[in-house]
Amino acid sequence: YDVADDTRRVKLANLLKSYGERVQLSVFECYLDEKLLQDLKARARRVLDLGQDALRLYPVQGEVEVLGTSPLGAEDPAFVVL
């Protein structure tokens, strides 16, 4: 994500933490079904200034290979990397 305002950035980070795991400073892995994804998008729109900020959502299809340790272990293959 790219959020111009510190207050909005903290709010968005806290929102994303409630859906998944922070893997880098502005990258989160979230295992989401369609309902949760739509909920996350709606809540993010209320936090973001869509004229200044950006949140990118990348659906991941297929297997994910992890080298090293991984705190996530969901069985559902449908997850989104933010």
Predicted features, each with a name:
Residues 1-27, 31-36:
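Extended, hydrophobic alpha-helical segments
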Residues 46-82:
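C-terminal structural segments of small proteins and small subunits
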Residues 11-16, 41-43, 65-66:
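Residue-level detector of functional hotspots within protein domains
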Residues 24-54, 59:
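Short, intrinsically disordered low-complexity segments
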